[in-house]
């Protein structure tokens, strides 16, 4: 129905026909059009170019994808961790600001049962305190410097609780909450489920874990919460796991066959952690649902603004 053509290719042909019409007839409207034919040609070309530019601009902004396609969603790994200290309030606010679809975070439980946002089981790398999370109480760590390891200007940044993060992110961004059980937890999964219910965020979050038993506990606490099983492999009979609504797969081990098999059973595919354009293009080409990256800006640019402006499109 549409074909690609150079700007103005078909328009002058109309006015060449008009020359013949002018010679054949002497009506007033033909005379006027003939007199202003150059202006009309120029204006027509401008209109066509303008419409085409608007079409391409909207397409590059993702506007034309809405309701038509399901473009790959972008998850900011531990928040916008390329620019801010990971798993902190500034990192999650940064992810929201740059338009990430999701933010990923890690949760653990302290000795007194507080659910905090922290990746490492040991606090030393980001706070300097050489203690395991499960060994300390919330009061012991709530005032620790959790930002200057990244940059001294973030020395006032503290470890956030999951509840604090939910308050910041509610209604602004989806969350992928990775549960990291220590073996000393009191009721980590149950507390996560309660918080999601309290803040009415069960439908805007997915709970993921390397421990399949954690997904079972989440589903038993609240079956409406979506879950994802984290794996570093993409082979084997994973696609029929009862308590997993999706799979989070390490990017270099992802296979197209696994993606196809999982999606045929209604499972979502999340891929981690993708920080290069080359790798991103490869995994997106496999038809995944969600990509996890430290740099959501780079990923958004490649996914939402693909390619260059095309040639002008004229109906034939």
List each language-model region with its residue ranges.
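Phosphate-group recognition and catalysis centered on beta-loop-alpha active-site segments
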Residues: 1-316
């Amino acid at each position: 129905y549409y074909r690609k053509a150079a700007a103005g290719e078909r328009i002058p042909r109309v006015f060449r026909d008009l020359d013949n019409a002018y010679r054949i007839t002497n009506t007033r409207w033909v005379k006027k059009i003939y007199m202003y034919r150059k202006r009309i040609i120029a204006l027509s070309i401008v209109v066509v170019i303008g419409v085409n530019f608007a079409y391409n601009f909207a397409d590059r902004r993702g506007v034309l994808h809405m309701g038509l396609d399901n473009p790959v969603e972008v998850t900011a790994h531990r928040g916008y961790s390329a620019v801010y200290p990971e798993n902190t309030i500034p990192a999650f606010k940064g992810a929201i600001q740059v338009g990430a679809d999701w933010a990923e975070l890690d949760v653990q439980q302290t000795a007194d049962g507080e659910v905090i946002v922290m990746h490492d089981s040991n606090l030393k790398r980001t706070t300097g305190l050489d203690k395991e999370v499960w060994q300390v109480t919330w009061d012991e760590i709530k005032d620790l410097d959790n930002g200057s390891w990244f940059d001294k200007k973030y020395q006032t940044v503290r470890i956030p609780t999951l509840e604090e993060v939910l308050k910041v992110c509610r209604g602004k961004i989806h969350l992928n909450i990775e549960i990291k059980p220590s073996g000393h937890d009191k009721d980590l999964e149950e507390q996560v489920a309660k918080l999601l219910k309290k803040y009415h965020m069960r439908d805007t979050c997915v709970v993921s874990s390397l421990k399949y038993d954690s997904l079972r506990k989440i589903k038993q606490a609240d079956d409406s919460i979506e879950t994802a099983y984290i794996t570093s492999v993409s082979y084997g009979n994973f696609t029929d796991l009862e308590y997993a609504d999706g799979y989070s797969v390490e990017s270099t081990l992802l296979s197209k066959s696994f993606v196809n098999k999982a999606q045929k059973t209604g499972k979502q595919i999340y891929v981690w952690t993708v920080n290069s354009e080359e790798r991103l293009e490869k995994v997106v080409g496999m038809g995944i649902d969600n990509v996890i990256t430290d740099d959501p800006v780079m990923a958004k640019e490649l996914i939402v603004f693909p390619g260059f402006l095309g040639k002008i499109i004229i109906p034939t």
